[in-house]
Amino acid sequence: MSIKIKYQKGLLRNMGIFDFKFIWLGQTVCRYNVPLDIFNVLNGIYETNFINLPDAHKQLAGKIAKENSLFFGGAANPRMHKHNTLPPYVLNWFESVFKHYLDFNKIHPYKLRMNSIWINEMKAGEYNPIHIHQGTIYTGLSSVMMLKLPKDMGPEYAREDVPMNGKLQILGAAGGQFVKSDYGPIANERDFYIFTYEMRHCVYPHTNPNAVRRTLAANMDVEYNPVGTRTAG
C-alpha cells in the first residue's frame, strides 16, 4: 500500500505508508459530534427552564446579555452557588468525551472533576473577547458546543469571501516555524470542541438582528503530572 504526498506544488511522489509517522508536539483541539439525544436535552433544558437558570455573568468574560448556568460543582462563592440541572447520563457523557481527549493525547494518570457548564446566547453585536478558562484548579479542559447557529450571520462589513461573523477563533499557545497557531473552524450545530484551559479563544459578533447564536461551554478540572506526560515519545 502506498500514499501520494504532495510536497511541492504540482509534484507528486509515491511513498510507502510504512515510511511515514506523524508526531505532534504542543497542544491539540479535538472536535466531537454530539449525540442527537444529548443535543436535544441540552437545548430543551435551556428553553423550558431558562427563567430558573442562575445568571453566570459575574464569573464570565463575555459581553453577552444571556449567560446562564446549567451546572456548578466548585466551591460556593459570592458569584455562584452549587447547582445541577442536568440528568446523570448527560454528565456521564461529558466525562466520557473529556476522558477520550486525555487518553488520545496520552495523558495519564489523571483525576477529573466537572467544574461548570453554562450556555451563552448571543444576539447581534454581542461577542466574547479573547480569554482563557479556569476551574477550581488551573489545569483542565474547556470546550465549546454549538447548540444553535443562524443560517444567516448577517452582512459582512468587508471581505465577504472570508466570513467572520459569529465565528469561533482558537489561538494556540505553541510558537516556532511552520506552527499552526490558530484555528477558526467552519462550525455546525452539534459540533463540540475541546481544548486546554489556558488556550486563548474568542467569538466574533454576528450582525443578524433576527437571530441568536447559542453555544455551551463546559470546564473540567484535570489533576495530572505535567512532568510525567510531557514527552511525545
Segments from the language model and where they lie:
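Residues at beta-strand starts and edge strands
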Residues: 26-28, 113, 139-141, 212-214
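Catalytic core of non-heme Fe(II) oxygenases with the double-stranded beta-helix
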Residues: 120-194, 204, 210-212, 226-231
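A short glycine-rich, His/Asp/Glu-containing loop-to-beta-strand
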Residues: 112-121
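A short alpha/beta connector and helix-capping loop motif
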Residues: 209-220
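Non-heme Fe(II)/2-oxoglutarate
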Residues: 2-109, 125-129
